[in-house]
Amino acid sequence: MGKQQKKHSKGRLDRYYYLAKEKGYRARSSFKIIQINEKYGHFLEKSKVVIDLCAAPGSWCQVASQLCPINSLIIGVDIVPIKPLPNVITFQSDITTEDCRSRLRGHMKTWKADTVLHDGAPNVGLGWVQDAFTQSQLTLQALKLAVENLTAGGTFVTKIFRSRDYNNLMWVFQQLFEKVEATKPPASRNVSAEIFVVCKGFKAPKKLDPRLLDPKEVFEELGGGNESKQNNEAKIFNPEKFSSQRQRQGYQEGDYTLFHTMPIMDFIKQDDPINQLGSLNKFDLPAPKDDDNDDDDHDHEWKILSKLKLCTPELLECIKDLKVLGRKEFKMILKFRKQARDILGIDKDEKEEEEENPKIEVEPLTEEQKIDQELQDLINKQKQKAKRLKKNANELKQKEIIRNQMNMLTDMNIGIEAAQIGADSLFNLKTAEKTGQLDKLAKGKKKMIFNDEELAKDNEIHIDEEEINDNDKDSADELDELENQLDDMYHQYQARKAERDANYRAKQARGDADDEAWNGIEEDNDDVESGKDYEMESESDDDDDEHIRLIAEKKSNGSLSRTARNFFASDSIFNELSDDVILEEIENKTKGSNGKMVESIQEQVANDNNENDDGDNDEEESDFEIVPNQKSDDDDDDESMNSDDDEVSTTTKSTTHQQKVDLATVEAMTLAHQVALGQKNKYDLIDEGINRYSFRDKDNLPDWFIDDEKKHSKLIKPITKEAAIAIKEKQKQLNARPIKKVLEAQSRKKLRALKRLEKIKKKSDLINEDSGKSERDKADEISKLMKKLNKKQKQKPKTTVVVARGSNRGLSGRPKGVKGKYKMVDGVMKNEQRALKRIAKKYKK
């Protein structure tokens, strides 16, 4: 007998066929899953549980058993039996039945699958449309099993055919997985219509709509044939353009013929002529009447219609082949149909039905109804406006929440407080015009000049002093309130800045070292002098009235201004002031000095007390508690001249004071060098402390103004190169110190070494106490223990960098004299690195 040869249909015996034979795979499809696995991140190597649906003959299970980790669970299912495979569980079942689900759950217990594979296909051969739909149904059933058994973030790989259900399946995949891609591996034949879809990142929804996996819902046809209607319209109104394009429509389901006909009378009576003209090939005329047949209505109607003028021989020839007609011929057929329907009365019947059902006329509205309707419209508009405002408010609130979450804490309320106050307090001409006082109001001093006639009529000008005082009080109160609001806003700004900036918090904690200590209150005659100046100005001004000048003098005679009185009244120190205690303190300070000076001070204080008692006794009746001042350094030196203990105490005080000083700035280091080298002494430092910024008046000034002035009211002190180098070296020493984590790690390492040493000591003691061993054996065992203690970790070999120049240029192998790992570098790589940095810097901007 001759040798039987295998058929080479569709190139089945290609190189993958022979490779599968060599590798021992059961089918050439093994290389499909291998190529998919390599393309999509080696997901099989990370899978502990794998399910292979429609696994026969088991080639994909073979690949999974080789690539998956050891002791992985691999389950293969198919409707046909599968020969046993090592490390693979196989059973025979239909994946569309409940039996398959229960058996899968029995094998998996409480586990979830990391990967589900599906390479199944139905028995093909019935028809392409039917085969593709069956494959889509099978894929949906496999997806249903995968959804039940996949873990969150799992992978699903399936085979599908490109058909009209492909997009529906892809939409379902995208609802359940984060990443969905279609691919065709090289091992798949080009003539095959199969493609593979890889779905990664299973979302694992808690609730799943059952319609998402129902074939009736997923593969439901949408549109209702609108596309065919549009195509038919194109065939009728633009047949030349439509006929020039290739139509890849195929056959309709259940209709596998290309030639369609219809009786002419049915075409006339139907309501969709365009669709019929586009889909039919021919209209059949009524057959001649036989003697055996009864009278037919269609024959009678056609006899009437055949006598029309539009029923020409050309028309009868055109209806025999509709596919070759143009726009002119189709219009002729439609005109004939319209005339035929008019003669047969088909359109008249429809008009009569419309006449039987007359249209309902709307009666005009009355005046009251119109008013009610307008009111209702206004109410509806108001509701819509309120709804819109509410929506805008919600949007603003949402934006504010987002701004707070992103730490965009810019104060948007700056100026609102001032606007609320100023809107009522500012002068407005409109309000003055409404009250009729606009003509009486004047601007500046010119309108305050009185004419001689007016003075003759009114010899005495009566001005209510209480009204003037009230106006002054109101304006002063407003100014005080504005100042308080500015102070509050500045404090809020400081609090916000302290929350954001740690350096600012530290600066606030340290305080301002430049601020001088408060040494009490000295009497000042600034207010009196200002009152005198004001008096001189009022006398020199000829335009002012004498009565107004007298009132101004009376107001200026007060000892303190309003702000000063508020300051002294708010401070508890001045409320508790006692003159007797002050006198005692002055006596103690001036003891041993000239007695006349003491007596003069006492007399002066007594006179001041008498004057103040006549004025305001209630404000100064409280007590004042004074803490005695510390003794000066000179007094301490005088008193402790003969005592050694005091000398020791002073030296300890000076040493502690020196320890607190930290030379952290270049200016401080420069000053320390100058003092140490004798370039400056104590008196030079005192002279430098007196400058144009030393005695600047800061009383009654707001904090925000003082803080802003401090930034600029500073002397720039000279520095030296040696001081800068010293500070730099100091910073280097600080930076050289390891961080806290490194110190903790080193201490933990030492602690572990000490623990190991303690263990070795205990073991060595036990070895020494063992009398059954010789001294040599004891020494050997103890030396072995010490070797374990001193054992160091292996260091990784360093990579040697070899420059490709000279003899190494163009070298393909290992350079001479280089051992271990090495890396070849050249000038091109350096230029490339520079270019990459330059590009990154460019796009960073």
Curated annotation (Swiss-Prot):
SUPFAM superfamilies: S-adenosyl-L-methionine-dependent methyltransferases. Residues 496-512 have a biased composition (Basic and acidic residues). This is AdoMet-dependent rRNA methyltransferase SPB1. Residues 366-402, 464-502, 739-796 form a coiled coil. It is an enzyme of class 2 (transferase). GO terms for molecular function: rRNA (guanine) methyltransferase activity; rRNA (guanosine-2'-O-)-methyltransferase activity; rRNA (uridine-2'-O-)-methyltransferase activity. Its EC number is 2.1.1.-. Residues 223-247, 279-298, 496-546, 587-660, 788-821 are annotated as: Disordered. Component of the nucleolar and nucleoplasmic pre-60S ribosomal particle.
